[in-house]
């Protein structure tokens, strides 16, 4: 049977980065690695309803910086910052180190593979049809700009005696293209018939194309800000010149240019 390599692990150093960034010698490496696993499990369990997609961990000396990517930052921060302060204190007691906790919002959770997988798993736990849950997730992702989505649900689907896998997909998901920005997520649904696994792949386009689109968007925003201020490159009063005005200026520049010299007359 064909097995698929993890899309994130295959693309680390190309279009993906490590979620854990620190260095340790052989004596301390295993202890710090186990500590990272405990931190991630604790945050995920405590804030599961907040839609936690990724948890990045950075270490420097005796300090730990944790970056939580969530779809609901308000649930993590809490009222007047009480939630994040309490979580920070609990992690400090668990690790015995100074903790710095940052929260980053996921603006489009429908395009985050981990959050999509968890959403489908929650719907399966509520006995919703797996085909309907997969179809709705794919439609939302494609409507928001995804170029391809693939979903696999495996287990005793619908309480069947024999486990099976069902797939749904739309668009393209080029798993062999290393420059492709493919997000992957996995979640499990705990049902009365046992666990049902949910795997989600979302293809958001090639990394170079996304970077170019971001640059074009930034240039457009700068032009709009310049237009509101009456910036350079515009006509009188900061207004954009029309096509006719630009053509008239070009004709005037051509007519005012240097005239050809008559070499036969010696002039």
UniProtKB/Swiss-Prot annotation:
The family note in this entry says: Belongs to the universal ribosomal protein uS3 family.
Q: Which UniProt keywords apply?
A: Ribonucleoprotein, Ribosomal protein, RNA-binding, rRNA-binding
| HAMAP family on file | Ribosomal_uS3_B
Q: Name one GO molecular function term.
A: structural constituent of ribosome
Region Disordered, residue ranges: 212-246
Q: Which CDD domains match?
A: KH-II_30S_S3
| InterPro entries assigned | KH_dom, KH_dom-like_a/b, KH_dom_type_2, KH_sf_prok-type, Ribosomal_S3_C_sf, Ribosomal_uS3_bac-typ, Ribosomal_uS3_C, Ribosomal_uS3_CS
Q: List the SUPFAM superfamilies hit by this protein, alphabetically.
A: Prokaryotic type KH domain (KH-domain type II) (SSF54814), Ribosomal protein S3 C-terminal domain (SSF54821)
Q: Where is the KH type-2 domain?
A: 39-107
Listed GO biological process terms:
translation
Q: What does this protein do?
A: Binds the lower part of the 30S subunit head. Binds mRNA in the 70S ribosome, positioning it for translation.
List the Gene3D superfamilies hit by this protein, alphabetically.
3.30.300.20, Ribosomal protein S3, C-terminal domain
* The keyword Lipid metabolism belongs to this UniProt entry's keyword annotation: no
Assembly and partners are described as: Part of the 30S ribosomal subunit. Forms a tight complex with proteins S10 and S14.
Is Ribonucleoprotein tagged as a keyword?
A: yes
The name on file for this protein is: Small ribosomal subunit protein uS3
Q: Where is the composition biased (Basic and acidic residues)?
A: 213-224
Please give an example of a GO cellular component term from this record.
Answer: cytosolic small ribosomal subunit
Gene designation per UniProt: rpsC
Q: Which domain of life is it from?
A: Bacteria
């Amino acid at each position: 049977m064909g097995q698929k390599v993890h899309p994130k692990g295959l693309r680390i150093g190309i279009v993906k980065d490590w979620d854990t960034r620190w260095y340790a010698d052989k004596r301390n490496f295993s202890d710090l690695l186990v500590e990272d696993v405990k931190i991630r499990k604790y945050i995920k369990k405590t804030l599961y309803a907040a839609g936690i997609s990724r948890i990045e961990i950075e270490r420097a000396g005796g300090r730990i910086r944790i970056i939580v990517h969530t779809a609901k930052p308000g649930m993590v921060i809490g009222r007047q910052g009480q939630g994040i302060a309490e979580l920070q204190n609990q992690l400090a007691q668990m690790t015995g180190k100074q903790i710095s906790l940052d929260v980053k919002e996921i603006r489009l959770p429908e395009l985050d593979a981990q959050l999509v997988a968890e959403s489908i798993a929650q719907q399966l736990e509520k006995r919703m049809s797996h085909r309907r849950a997969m179809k709705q997730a794919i439609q939302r992702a494609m409507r928001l700009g995804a170029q391809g989505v693939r979903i696999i649900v495996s287990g005793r689907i619908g309480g069947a005696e024999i486990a099976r896998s069902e797939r749904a997909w739309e668009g393209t998901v080029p798993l062999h293209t290393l420059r492709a920005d493919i997000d992957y997520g996995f979640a499990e649904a705990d049902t009365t018939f046992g666990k049902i696994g949910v795997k989600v792949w979302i293809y958001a386009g090639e990394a170079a194309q996304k970077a170019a689109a971001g640059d074009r968007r930034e240039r457009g925003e700068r032009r709009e800000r310049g237009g509101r201020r009456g910036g350079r490159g515009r006509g009188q009063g900061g207004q954009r010149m029309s096509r006719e005005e630009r053509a008239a200026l070009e004709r005037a520049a051509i007519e005012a240019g240097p005239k050809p010299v008559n070499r036969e007359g010696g002039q």
